[in-house]
């Protein structure tokens, strides 16, 4: 079971410190290091395949949540998020 409140807090820290990238297209063109991709449980199959291809090319980890990212990020239709801070990514993975 995932610790939803802790994961939400760490994602919130990443957003406030501008260490998060939103959306599959933005993740694909982002040039700097990404440490973790977080996907929502309601992501479509085609988008999930696209994210998996990106992750395989760049050797990234994917974490699928049991809940919606929209509730955490307060952004409408947010289903994919990348974390660019190593420590926050590690903390999110440890609480998943």
Regions found by a protein language model. Name each.
Residues 6-36:
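N-terminal first-folded block
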Residues 16, 24-28, 46-73:
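Positively charged, polar, low-complexity stretches
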Residues 19, 61, 80-81:
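A residue-level structural signature of the nucleotidyltransferase/glycosyltransferase Rossmann-like core
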Residues 36-39, 79:
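Short, well-ordered secondary-structure micro-motifs within conserved domains or adaptor modules
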Residues 39-40, 84:
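Small/polar loops that bind or transfer phosphate-bearing groups
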Residues 41-45:
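Glycine-rich phosphate-binding loops at beta-strand->alpha-helix junctions
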